[in-house]
Amino acid sequence: MLSREEILEILSEYDLEDLSIATLGSHTALHILKGAKEEGLRSVVVCEEGRTTPYERLGVADEIIVVERFQDMLDEEVQERLRELNAIVVPHGSFVAYVGLDGIENEFCVPMFGNRRLLRWESERSLERKLLKRAGVKVPKVFDSPEDIDRPVIVKFPGARGGRGYFICSDPEEFEEKAERLIEDGVIDEEDLEQAHIEEYVVGTNFCVHYFRSVVEDTVEVLGMDRRYETNIDGLVRMPAGDQLEAGLEPSYVISGNIPVVVRESLLVQLYEMGDRVVRASEDIEEPGFIGPFCLQTLCTEDLEFYVFELSARIDGGTNVTFLPYAYLKFGEIVTMGRRIAKEVREARDKGLLEGVVT
């Protein structure tokens, strides 16, 4: 595991007046890069061959580093170029998925915005639940074995899959039937099934709440929220019930887009309290706790109580909706999560706090 001291030693050799914000060319890269430029920082993207077009045509990247595969971001040549550019790398879901947690923790010797140690806590269900339970927020009941299923549950699998392979069932027999079908179709394998996370299906409305823990301002901000647009479930529910039954299609929950939403103003108090609790718990678990963006994926029940069913320990894909209403209220202008990150980096540099926002 790379120590924070090793990363800070690298940071100490940077020309702080010539900083870059860098990221992998996927997920939320467009907003991260645009935000860097808006705050007067150089923007750098590491991109796979054949995937540079959006960054070129939209003009958001000052430099494009082309690699054969995303995993090549770990190559020493690429890392050296990032250090030459005085780059601070912003992690996102694709970065975690392609570069890998072991690579990020042990091999990636470039300063990263945020707490790299917390990325594992979002990827492993048992760790994620431990953090949420420590925070004291409401979470769905978890079932240790398919044999214990006695109510509607949703079955999830490890890693950043964007909902692929998830399914709902109500008893052990239905679990076995649906799991076997997914294995036959090549969606999951036996190893995935052994690591299946089975949790109570909470009926409620979906709010994915986008937070920002600011070291510079010493506060936790709620910037905006979205809900997921999932295929094929969102298409199925548009069909009459009789047609759904006749079609015999198995619902899937693969995220294909995001829809901006706002919550009733009276519920914001709960959301701020949840964010504060999660940040305090993260400080106890992996110092210095959350830095910058994180997301709580929640369900709001008919009793107007929030259950947290998933955590993102970095910028979440839902921030691609651009307009974050509470960020607008705070800053008086449209501030994307990408720009909020760059603003924190710039202000931390200007106030001598940069060591506090990287690991």
Curated annotation (Swiss-Prot):
EC nos: 6.3.4.23
Taxonomy of the source species: Archaea, Methanobacteriati, Methanobacteriota, Methanomada group, Methanopyri
Name this protein carries in UniProt: 5-formaminoimidazole-4-carboxamide-1-(beta)-D-ribofuranosyl 5'-monophosphate synthetase
Cofactor mode of binding and number, as noted: Binds 1 Mg(2+) or Mn(2+) ion per subunit.
Family: Belongs to the phosphohexose mutase family.
Requisite cofactors: Mg(2+); Mn(2+)
Chain's role: Catalyzes the ATP- and formate-dependent formylation of 5-aminoimidazole-4-carboxamide-1-beta-d-ribofuranosyl 5'-monophosphate (AICAR) to 5-formaminoimidazole-4-carboxamide-1-beta-d-ribofuranosyl 5'-monophosphate (FAICAR) in the absence of folates.
Gene symbol of the encoding locus: purP
Domain ATP-grasp intervals: 116-340
SUPFAM superfamilies, sorted: Glutathione synthetase ATP-binding domain-like (SSF56059), PreATP-grasp domain (SSF52440)
